[in-house]
Amino acid sequence: MLSNNDFIPLATRMRPGCLEEFVGQSHLLGKDKPLFRAIEKGKLHSMILWGPPGSGKTTLAEIIAQKAGARVESISAVLAGVKDIRDVVERAERHKGQATILFVDEVHGFNKSQQDAFLPHVEKGTITLIGATTENPSFQLNNALLSRTRVYVLKQLTEADLLSILENALANEERGLGKKALEIPEPLRRRIVQFADGDARQCLNLLEIIADFALEENGRFVVDDGLIDKVLTEGLRRFDKRGEAFYDQISALHKSVRGSDPDASLYWLSRLLDGGCDPFYVARRVVRMASEDIGNADPRALQLALDAWETFERLGTPEGELAIAQAVVYCACAAKSNAVYKAFNAASREVKSTGSLEVPLYLRNAPTRLMKSLDYGKDYRYAHDESDGFAAGVDYLPESLIGRRYYFPINRGLEIKIKEKLEYYRKLNEQHKTTEDSKN
């Protein structure tokens, strides 16, 4: 016969009710940590709990409220609006003798005006705000709200953490699966934990599904590889297409390419694609890497990156992903230079600081008689008619910027040759200047 407990999800039944049952986050909840001491003493302060799904944000908020003997009002930023916040505040004011905690799940979902609605009530102490978010608060929450709260970063649970949670659920007869006599060999437990990818809720949900499908043999419910294979059909990676993990992984890919590590580059590329990242986005980023971090040290990298982009457009997933992988490996192994990147930034800063300086007359086009009469294009020297294809002594910058340099090629790859050629041209300019000075 089914009990009422059987209709409650295992993850809910096994939710810790006190700090002693809470698994993980020892950097916050160690006995010598400020947050642990504050919770134990029942001291409340507004906070943002930032961490990945299944890391314990909601559970921790409930434990904090229970320890403080506070009323709890819970809303989801995805569904609630300013009116819901006002209703919570009104109820809190009617219960002034008892602290009110407003727990806001997915708090990053509130826009600026909704976030501002909290501020006066947090400042007056009418409510204590505990917001939970999977997104970086510095990007998603306004400064006024952040300045009135403390941000606590919850880490992804380790495999050891999840094993502890799983084994507790298997052993617990009151809230868990202890009465079912479920037998899961150690290697299969680790497969479940690895599949859950740091998410305690996901781990327990998987365990519950496995328990439901397990077949009884002589009074025991045995789990084998076949059952695990059926349940664990598709990985759920720690990834959000526009969340913190997304940008972390893109950053890791870019830095691995820049650091000339093809193996790490392939790993992070695979993580992104496995997590559902748009391959076109990755292809665009690889083009950026080819320009920013390789540049003229190996111009073939840019062409290969563009070819990979086009190849993916033609082939799609999954065949076209190999072309992106090829470009990533080439870029990781190519000679590196950020000289063009730095030069372009320097030139852009110059333009912003100096404004619209005039183009020298001899560099201007003169398609009409009037322009020619105004000396447009006068004394311009056509470089192809000069020795070495270089018009020594000609200045191409505005007069006030003559002599300014932005591009400094380095001693790697093709830029070695570029550097030699530019040094040769500078010597020709110096010789021309010396010759002109001697004439005067």
From Swiss-Prot:
Binding site for ATP: 51-58
GO terms under biological process: DNA synthesis involved in DNA repair; DNA-templated DNA replication
Domain of life: Bacteria
Alphabetized GO MF terms: ATP binding; ATP hydrolysis activity; DNA binding; enzyme activator activity; single-stranded DNA helicase activity
Record carries keyword Nucleotide-binding: yes
Disulphide bonds in the chain: none
SMART domains: AAA (SM00382)
Role, per record: DNA-dependent ATPase that plays important roles in cellular responses to stalled DNA replication processes.
UniProt record similarity statement: Belongs to the AAA ATPase family. RarA/MGS1/WRNIP1 subfamily.
PANTHER family: ATPASE WRNIP1, WERNER HELICASE-INTERACTING PROTEIN 1 FAMILY MEMBER
Protein name according to UniProt: Replication-associated recombination protein A
Organism per entry: Coxiella burnetii (strain RSA 493 / Nine Mile phase I)
